[in-house]
UniProtKB/Swiss-Prot annotation:
GO function term, MF aspect, one: ATP binding
Gene3D superfamilies: 3.40.1380.10, ATP synthase, gamma subunit, helix hairpin domain (1.10.287.80)
Pfam families: ATP-synt
UniProt topology in membrane: Peripheral membrane protein
Gene designation per UniProt: atpG
Cellular location(s): Cell inner membrane
Protein's UniProt name: ATP synthase gamma chain
Length: 287
């Protein structure tokens, strides 16, 4: 019954794989709750910074920070792309890269050059493979990233924008909607869109020392860093959610495969037993 032994071996192999996918699913389910908590905790800071930027920008009417000024001609575009370090997350990273390449193409058609800063091993490997000009990279941030880990690569792009080497900067990441939905997001980071630094009312009561322009100079960089950090946290939550869903689907498929193989094994065993009985009956009749 060699066929039966082969089927049993395959069933055992699929069962072992199912143990791995179930374990990964449970680990991701545990991590996603912590990732959501970190994401929600950091949101108020980013929102408060956004409001302060709006107040400062309107208070300093005679000074325009470079991060707020739209440039007439865009010769070079920079992208900060956030991905996961690990795989087994369904199409999370590939969908993000596909969206980005679609957004990049119109700029390339206009003759603009492209610079990329990557956060995450998957993005780094992808853009090296397609030979895009990478000017900075950071990987292995872990499940609890800190903003200090990001300051270096963010500074690379901010300096390039300030020095006029890059005329526009975009932030590309997976936005966490819910456990089942993660959306590839593509947002303009620099210059800040007008809606980002305008507020509806002028009824704030702030005193700026030494003046609004000086405060704006210091706050603006912190604000950009907070936006990127928030995007990283969103991407981490998206990664765990996508992996949990992917591993559940893999476990379900393994269950179906085991059921199918078990049925095939039972049929093969039944056929072998029937054959043995037939041979015994035939032998007895001959005697």
């Amino acid at each position: 019954m060699a066929g039966g032994r082969e089927i049993k071996t395959k069933i055992k192999s699929v069962q072992n794989t199912r143990k791995v996918t179930r374990a990964l699913e449970m680990v991701s389910a545990s991590k996603i709750r912590k990732a959501q908590e970190r994401m929600k905790t950091s949101r108020p800071y980013a929102q408060a910074m956004k409001q302060v930027i709006g107040h400062l920008a309107q208070a300093s009417t005679d000074y325009q920070h470079p991060f707020l000024v739209e440039r007439e001609q865009v010769k070079r575009v920079g992208y900060i792309v956030i991905s996961s370090d690990r795989g087994l997350a369904g199409g999370l990273n590939n969908n993000l890269f596909r969206k980005m390449l679609g957004e990049v193409r119109p700029w390339q058609d206009k003759g603009a050059e492209i610079d990329v800063v990557t956060i995450g091993q998957k993005a780094s490997a992808f853009f090296r493979r397609i030979k895009v000009n990478m000017v900075g990279s950071v990987t292995h941030l872990g499940d609890s990233p800190h903003i200090e880990q990001l300051v270096g690569v963010i500074k690379v792009m901010l300096d390039a924008f300030t020095e006029g080497k890059v005329d526009r900067v975009y932030l590309v990441y997976n936005r966490f909607v819910n456990t089942m939905t993660q959306k590839a997001s593509f947002e303009q980071l620099l210059p800040l869109p007008a809606a980002e630094h305008k507020v509806a009312h002028h009824d704030w009561d702030y005193l700026y020392e030494p003046d609004a322009a000086t405060v704006l100079e210091h706050v603006m960089t912190r604000y950009i860093e907070s936006l990127v950090y928030q995007a990283v946290l969103e991407n981490v939550a998206s990664e765990h959610a996508a992996r949990m869903v992917a591993m559940k689907a893999a476990s379900d498929n393994a269950n179906k495969m085991i059921g199918t193989l078990q049925l095939v094994y039972n049929k093969a065993r039944q056929a072998a037993i029937t054959q043995e009985i037939s041979e015994i009956v035939s032998g007895a009749a001959a005697v």
